[in-house]
Amino acid sequence: FGANDNMTRAQVCQMFYNLLLDKDVAITVNFADVSDGAWYAKAVNTLASLGIVKGIGDGMFAPDRAISRAEFAAIASRFAKASNVGSVSFADVFADDWFYDPVLTAVSYGWISGYEDGTFKPNANITRAEVTSITNRMLARAADTNFLAGNVAALKQFSDVPVTHWAYGVVMEAVNGHDHSKTDGVESWNGLTR
């Protein structure tokens, strides 16, 4: 799965593109470093045309560059069309930072949190496991731990995400298609769909 690998800008675009309900979007933005044949081209250009992602300047996107926690918070907030609903204080996030509002938005919605030392680490790269965890929270998805425990052999597994990994349930939720029902916001899996 690459749980501890840094998430790239292209990967984030593809993930959010896959979540779009309406993919029929007029492409109004293209980047010089995103070739038409690239696996992520449609995702990048669509999300850029919707104003969800932005380039790095000079008509470039830097698709292979690792994405920071601040960048991801900004993209997630724009994707969800969410705005800041609270106030949170971090030692390294200031009102004049470009990412101030998106970080506070993501935190106020409970999608992402800071660290015990009172920092957010906005410029730190974000991992695939962290992105999966945040995205599941955005979508109000959570794995049914009882189902997971009773069906380990049937689940799509990854050697770098053992049952003891902090993101095991998060990853299982994201990669294993399943039928489910919800009661009081708690997801109960009824079976795998593959």
PLM feature spans:
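Feature responds to low-complexity, polar/acidic, surface-exposed segments characteristic
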Residues: 1-13, 17-42, 49-70, 78-102, ...
